[in-house]
């Protein structure tokens, strides 16, 4: 459904990533794990995961947009948002979209995997689980090129300390000055679990990462395709 929004704030997070708060002219009903599209033109709709959870957004929608210099696709959206914030103009979105929302009727443990700004997808799901006091085991693996990309690392470490059923594992590719897990986030998951058969797996990142996860987890770790969720799976 097309909805006009005001841009309430734009906050730089780290590594060319911005937290953007939108205030829609009417409430948007969505599920944790869904996404919206920013309408840049009649045939130009650009998808971004909703980072806020349905039960906490208080009418606002939070986005985390990574707009590195080489990424004009996202950078143009951020510039459009900045212009709307300065002028008080509207941003047109279309929402909600996606079938990779949290399956709340499942009793299985949850594995949340994010690559880079794919974190916004799993953040919505994690925040929803906390606010709804869902107590089943939740494992969150977040991979980035370096520690700078993991802009919510301190927040997630605090959450994991406060909730014994939540485990947070950051993984970076560049190990200089880093004492945690290094390398590929999918390899880190495979090293930590003998089997993924009894897990609901939610994943967000580049299409090639999602495809590799589906292939490797089902063939090597007994994961079930029907228990793998991610927007990429609708396209690959």
From Swiss-Prot:
UniProt keyword list: FAD, Flavoprotein, Luminescence, Oxidoreductase
Gene3D superfamilies: Nucleotide-binding domain of ferredoxin-NADP reductase (FNR) module, Translation factors
EC number: 1.5.1.-
Residue span, FAD-binding FR-type domain: 1-103
Binding site residues for pyridine: 115-119
Any one Gene Ontology BP term: bioluminescence
Entry-linked InterPro entries: Cbr1-like_FAD-bd_dom, FAD-bd_FR_type, FNR_nucleotide-bd, MRET, OxRdtase_FAD/NAD-bd, Riboflavin_synthase-like_b-brl
GO molecular function: oxidoreductase activity
Domain of life (superkingdom): Bacteria
Purpose of the protein: Involved in bioluminescence. It is a good supplier of reduced flavin mononucleotide (FMNH2) to the bioluminescence reaction. Preferably uses riboflavin as an electron acceptor when NADPH is used as an electron donor.
NCBIfam families found in the cross-reference section: PRK08051.1
Family: Belongs to the Fre/LuxG FAD/NAD(P) flavoprotein oxidoreductase family.
Name of the protein in its database record: NAD(P)H-flavin reductase
Lineage start: Bacteria, Pseudomonadati, Pseudomonadota, Gammaproteobacteria, Vibrionales
Gene behind this protein: fre
